[in-house]
């Protein structure tokens, strides 16, 4: 594709036309250049992957039962002793000296970030990263799970209020005759400064030491749309929470992936509220993914579970699989991560239940969605992008048409997909989805390679820019008439 010669671009934008039209052109060019390509997929150019992050290796250790996890492209156990995996989660006790308070109010590592040496923490964190991720060529998912406090003062409510209380006490003990307003101001400022430093410098350390890894914090960004019991619940993120997410630009700029979470309550099984809850959480993460200083949109991996939040062994219904995993894929996420705790492996019976579900309804649905995403990427985007809904609220999903495909489980535990997309299937995909091109590609079907990149990694063809200029100028002239 030929780029517009420098002289032509100058002719379009800087000829002595009315200032308003010139500003309009610059504004539109800036808007177009702000569109970011997707980061190249983490695994074999697959547009949507499934990763496993549960301690089911214990099923083999305790009961000699091997779980078949072949439907997952990436697998990692969160157990303390496991290392060298391609899905790594760092809990509070595994990465440096993370400060927090127990439920009894006992401080661990100083309790508050402003009470702990950041340099000592980072030195220990570097050792922990080398232990859990020994390979410098690690290119998997690196997730930091720090949930005891949030870096923004206003978000430390309920049980997290102890961090505000202790921060106030710290200031009042240091200074005599200080007003309540000054205590609040100083406590907030010192806490947020230290909290930011802890989170920002820790993830920067991870990215520097394992630069190919996809580093991010679990549950960030959060939509805080938990009021699912409200009448006429829409799932939308409260406006103040969207603004607070905007204020975390330092965190998004330090991350190389985003890891929001969608956990479903049993009381909302098969509910439309579950769909709304999931949809807005994923959509908010996708919004944030484009707001960073990176040349590409950060990949979004949505954490979910096999079962409901209160009963992890009561597995998600088919409808709730669609409302969580299917919704994530259709909106443009890079994949899902299935998380689980020791409940899944507490008995041989539980291990058997998990294995049975993964190799039946759950596995079949994962294969359905991941394969449909591949078909759509190949057909619409020439394997150079992922398919995203044209209308984000529409009930259109990346599913294989059962009239064209048949999914069956083989004796060795693998799922076999038979069939091919019909012309009608492909036409329906084209009608309902569009392409989000990967880095280095552009165009409606991502077939064109980007020959030169601006700040966003995108370029404009000469015909596109000329057409744009003509349209803007014509519009301006019609306004003048």
Curated annotation (Swiss-Prot):
GO molecular function: chondroitin hydrolase activity; hyalurononglucosaminidase activity
Glycan-modified residues: 64, 115, 232, 343
Active site positions: 147 (proton donor)
Segments on the Extracellular side according to the record's topology features: 33-455
Transmembrane regions listed in the UniProt entry: 12-32, 456-476
Entry keyword set: Disulfide bond, EGF-like domain, Glycoprotein, Glycosidase, Hydrolase, Membrane, Transmembrane, Transmembrane helix
GO cellular component: cell surface; lysosome; membrane
PROSITE patterns according to UniProt: EGF_1, EGF_2
Catalyzed reactions per annotation: Random hydrolysis of (1->4)-linkages between N-acetyl-beta-D-glucosamine and D-glucuronate residues in hyaluronate
Membrane topology of the entry: Multi-pass membrane protein
Disulfide bridge partners, by residue number: 59-351, 223-237, 376-387, 381-435, 437-446
Residues exposed to the Cytoplasmic side: 1-11, 477-481
EC id: 3.2.1.35
GO BP field: carbohydrate metabolic process; chondroitin sulfate proteoglycan catabolic process
Task performed by this protein: Endo-hyaluronidase that degrades hyaluronan to smaller oligosaccharide fragments. Also has chondroitin sulfate hydrolase activity, The best substrate being the galactosaminidic linkage in the sequence of a trisulfated tetrasaccharide.
Similarity comment text for this entry: Belongs to the glycosyl hydrolase 56 family.
Protein name: Hyaluronidase-4
Gene name tied to this protein: Hyal4
